[in-house]
A protein has these predicted regions:
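Thiol/disulfide oxidoreductase modules built on the thioredoxin-like
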Residues: 114-116, 126-187
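A short beta-strand-turn-helix
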Residues: 36-62
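Sec-exported extracytoplasmic/periplasmic mature domains
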Residues: 57, 76, 83-90, 112-119, ...
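Hydrophobic beta-strand anchors of alpha/beta hydrolase catalytic cores
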Residues: 63-64, 95, 153
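Conserved redox-active cysteine motifs that mediate thiol-disulfide chemistry
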Residues: 66-83
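N-terminal targeting signals for export/organelle localization
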Residues: 1-43, 185-189, 194-205
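Second-shell loop/turn segments in exported
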Residues: 67-70, 96-97, 173-174
Length: 205
């Protein structure tokens, strides 16, 4: 019993240390049951609804990042998300931002005149919606105990998702906090390589 208690204390101490470094909330990449659903949300640039399946079409790996525009931890991750997107976009990697708990005007202000480098859609605009969004539900399923859960990242492999129905995938790799760049970079690289290796090129006459 004492040894078990000791392990629990060590785990909690390590978790606190990892999450508290320099105001960051880093979290490891883990596979979780999430029952992630398809959605249709309004695009920040076009002001028109976009369907997730449509955005994923033709991609090998998709990272959906949920964020609040006013959140300091999102401000920490945003450059990393943009960097990874620029590095791997030509290899079939897609980033999609889903804004939460802040107005679309605030989201536009955050990204500046150039706008976001990848598609951004809106799920909610009010802090009052904190416990009403699908984002909140996914966080509960994956054990995210943070107050706002920004950022929250989920990785989808389009080739392995359900092509019909509400639920895209039962399980997925998620990050309940800020990305650990080196870890996620390796994950993206290996998954893109695996996806490419699995592509069968038709014979040409």
């Amino acid at each position: 019993m004492k040894s078990l208690l000791g392990l629990v204390i060590i785990a909690l101490t390590f978790s606190t240390f990892v999450r508290a470094q320099g105001g960051h909330e880093y979290s490891p990449l883990v596979e979780k049951t999430v029952n992630y659903k398809n959605w249709s949300l309004v695009n920040l640039k076009t002001d028109k609804p976009e369907d997730l399946r449509s955005i994923m079409a033709g991609k090998k790996l998709v990272m959906v990042v949920y964020f609040a525009p006013w959140c300091g931890n999102w401000h920490n991750e945003a450059p990393i998300a943009a960097k990874l997107y620029e590095k791997y976009k030509d290899q079939g990697f897609q980033v999609i931002g889903v804004s939460e708990y802040g107005s679309r005007a605030d989201v536009r202000t955050f990204f500046g005149e150039a706008g976001p480098p990848y598609p951004v859609v809106t799920e909610s605009e009010s802090r009052d919606d904190k416990q009403k969004t699908p984002h909140y539900g996914y966080r509960q399923l994956t054990g995210d105990t943070r107050n706002w859960g920004s950022p929250w990242n989920i990785f989808l492999e389009p080739a392995k998702t359900n092509q019909t129905g509400d639920v895209l995938t039962e399980k997925a790799w998620v990050v309940n906090g800020e990305l650990i760049e080196d870890e996620v970079d390796k994950f993206i690289s290996s998954h893109l390589a695996s996806a490419s290796a699995g592509v069968i090129t038709p014979c040409k006459n």
